[in-house]
Amino acid sequence: MRERDLESLEYRKFLNLLSSYTHNEITKNKINNLKPITNREFLEREIAKASEFESIFLKEGYFPLSEFPDITQAINLAKVEDSILSPKEIFEIGEILRVVKNVKSFLSNHTLNHLKKLFQNLTPLRELEKFITDSIDSDFAVKDSASKDLARIRKEIKEVEKLINNQLEKILNNPNYQDAIQEKLITLRRDRFVIPVKYNFSHRIKGIIQDRSSSGNTVYVEPFEVVPLNNKLTDLKLQENLEIRKILRFLTDIIRTKINFISNSFDALIEFDILYTKAKFSKAFNCRFPQIGESYQLYNAKHPIFLLKEKPFIPIDILLDEKRGLVITGPNTGGKTVALKTAGLLSLIFQSAIAIPVDEGSKIPIFNGIFIDIGDYQSIEENLSTYSAHIKNIREMLDLANKNSLLLFDELIPGTDPDFASAIGIAILDYVKEKNIRVIATTHLKKIKAYVLNNDYFKIAAVGFDKETLTPTYKIYYNAVGESMAFYIAQKLNLQKEIIEKAKSLISKDLLNFEELASKFSALISEYEEKIKEINQLKQQLELEKAKYENLAKQLEKDKKEKWKESLKEIQDFVEKIRQEGYEVLKEVKERQSGAPLEKFVKEKKNINIKTEEEIKAEEIKEGDVVRIKGKTQEGTVIAIREDKANVNFGGIKIWLPLNQLEKRQPKEEKTTFKITKSKTDITPSINLIGKTKEEAIKELEKYIDKVILEGYTTFKIIHGYGAGVLRNAVREYLDKLPFKLKYEDAPYHEGGLGVTIVRFEE
């Protein structure tokens, strides 16, 4: 694509504004140098990566990437044999390794498809990172802990400095030297500790003059008493520098062996930072990727620069569906140009794998070139008029464009007589049609409007205009023709009436009729579009209601099947129980050689009724009824009903339960009787689940709670131990799902603490 087109459509300006979403200069440079992608396969891969990253970002609400240093030069230097990196360069490599570790850890919690390769390029080097952290501090100084020798040398340096200090303090405080001392100060000159002495008294203090003040009134003397110590200090500092160089060489050599991993990780970090920047822009303005296709349909499109600069902007629909040409008409008030530039810029941004501010359902083609003719191209240097410059640019555009390109013309053709401009403009549109090139053009010329109305290659549209404020509304009305508004604006701005009347008399009746018809036509189109909008809204509501109904029907069918499965299982279990009891009776008959057990069995079972689902549903639960929780065996008596809940007494424990969780059973006066009595089991007020799997523990706990209720316990303990917390969490999740009103908490420390959960039933 031509750089002049990118500039004209403000693509570079957009990228510059987008780059403000990152604090990293290297990422900013990469973003500012982005170019639209024309290869479909490559673009789809980049969009897939951006979409996958954004979904992770939106799910987590953050990404662990902030400002990081640019280590490009350090990487290049480390690749040079025998080179030694500076402490700052090594520290910054350590910073990058820390960021890589954090990002890798964060992404490890997500299933990656399109980002997998980029993720694999992140290589945390924890040992190297620790070496660097232990060796260099945030002020880029080598730490004492970098080596034992360095720690020893620095300790000696401090000791010698202390001795020098003490010696010089004695001289400074000696009464015999007070008239010779310029200031009680110990300072450094030429890396040696000295004291300031008045020039006229320099002979009083024996030593070496290391420096003189700019005024000449002060000399800096190194007393002979500290010369040996200063010499020793100099030697120690040389040793320190050699040891630091040795440490830096060691660290650089390690870095050099890992330089490819570091380089790949750094490149991957930059790519993730670019994706992060794109995702932040997308989230801020509710952007999305349109579907790639042949048609060009952008719904509620917004100009991104308006958004980034927080300027008000009315969303527009840009539609090139079955037709490949769109001509936008209307007065010269800026609305047409904004629509044209919005279409071009959004296409460029999309082809940079950046989501754009449009609504769901939008579609867009991939263009191999987007070319625009806009503005005043007058060139003094090339001695070209505005018209000549436009013609030269249009010729180049038409030479470069093909059926996969997008041509944008702002006002066909400016800078010349309207009749000639109309003729050339129509000829250009005809040429574009012959070459089957997509085109969006703007015009206010009536002949071009008439041509477009009679040509099925093009769709015509008009930009709305507010007659009160004399400004464009920016809304695009399709199948409408824009008025010139010249007379109306002149009249509104109080141009002399006789001038307006004279002007009208100079215009042909055909043109006035055309403008009048265009105005009426636009009004009808607006009314028609409003009706269509209402119909579409009703259609959407109908679709939603239909979807709700279908989902409800599916759920009812599912519930019905599940209910019948439960009923069938109950019947099968019941039949199996009867069969087993029958076997026991037959066995007893054989053993006793008597029919009495059989007669008793028949008598007990002959009055058993199996009710249908409908009969069970028809029964209403009321006070005094014997009920049980669906799926459970314990039975209780309803003692009160309030709205959709019942208070049930289970062997002394009273619990409020939703009615839809209860099922009615025959009360005890009917033929088949049930009675809740306290069992004579040896159940204790605690259960030990340690050593069991999650499934085993929950199954055993379920049985235990049934018995606890029957025994009348209001408090019990669940012993699950500490471990990894799996059993504890499973127990508490199970308790949360129970229909009983209960509370639970960790046991006191002396009763087991976190390894024991205490449960209390509440009335």
Curated annotation (Swiss-Prot):
Endonuclease that is involved in the suppression of homologous recombination and thus may have a key role in the control of bacterial genetic diversity. Acts as a ribosome collision sensor, splitting the ribosome into its 2 subunits. Detects stalled/collided 70S ribosomes which it binds and splits by an ATP-hydrolysis driven conformational change. Acts upstream of the ribosome quality control system (RQC), a ribosome-associated complex that mediates the extraction of incompletely synthesized nascent chains from stalled ribosomes and their subsequent degradation. Probably generates substrates for RQC. One of its GO terms (biological process) is mismatch repair. Homodimer. Binds to stalled ribosomes, contacting rRNA. InterPro entries: DNA_mismatch_repair_MutS_C (IPR000432), DNA_mismatch_repair_MutS_core (IPR007696), DNA_mismatch_repair_MutS_sf (IPR036187), MSSS (IPR046893), MutS (IPR045076), MutS2 (IPR005747), P-loop_NTPase (IPR027417), Smr_dom (IPR002625). The gene is mutS2. Gene3D superfamilies: 3.30.1370.110, P-loop containing nucleotide triphosphate hydrolases (3.40.50.300). Signal peptide: none annotated. This is Endonuclease MutS2. One of its GO terms (molecular function) is mismatched DNA binding. Its EC number is 3.1.-.-, 3.6.4.-. It comes from Sulfurihydrogenibium sp. (strain YO3AOP1). Keywords: ATP-binding, DNA-binding, Endonuclease, Hydrolase, Nuclease, Nucleotide-binding, RNA-binding, rRNA-binding. Belongs to the DNA mismatch repair MutS family. MutS2 subfamily. The lineage of its organism: Bacteria, Pseudomonadati, Aquificota, Aquificia, Aquificales. ATP binds at G330, P331, N332, T333, G334, G335, K336, T337. It holds the Pfam family Smr. Residues 687-762 form the Smr domain. The keyword Thylakoid does not apply.
